[in-house]
Amino acid sequence: MKVLTLNVCGIRASQKKGLFKWLSKVKADIICLQEVRASEEQIQSKEFMLSNYKRYLSEASKKGYSGVCIYTKEDPIKINKAFGS
């Protein structure tokens, strides 16, 4: 199993620099992105999708801050979007 973790310092800016082209070449089973700094509404377009992956986003409560996003080829057993859940 290949797992990739990456601090993107803004998923939208990283997408413009070729992040998703690179991710599709890496072919990791699980991709964990930190500091995505975007809401679900902001990353709905196809530019933020990866073929054969499901996406799970946990947004920061304050807009433009933090947030994590996971792309996975397999369905997770459980998804926790907050501590203690």
List the predicted regions and their residue ranges:
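Extreme N-terminal starter segment of soluble prokaryotic enzymes
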Residues: M1-T5
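Active-site beta-strand/loop signature of hydrolases that rely on acidic residues for catalysis
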Residues: L6-N7, L23-E41
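Short histidine/acidic/glycine/proline-rich micro-motifs that form metal-
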Residues: C9-G10, S85
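Short, acidic/polar
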Residues: R12-K25
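Activation segment
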Residues: R12-Q15, E40, N80
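Structured beta-strand-rich core segments of catalytic domains in phosphoester-bond hydrolases
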Residues: R37, Q44-S85
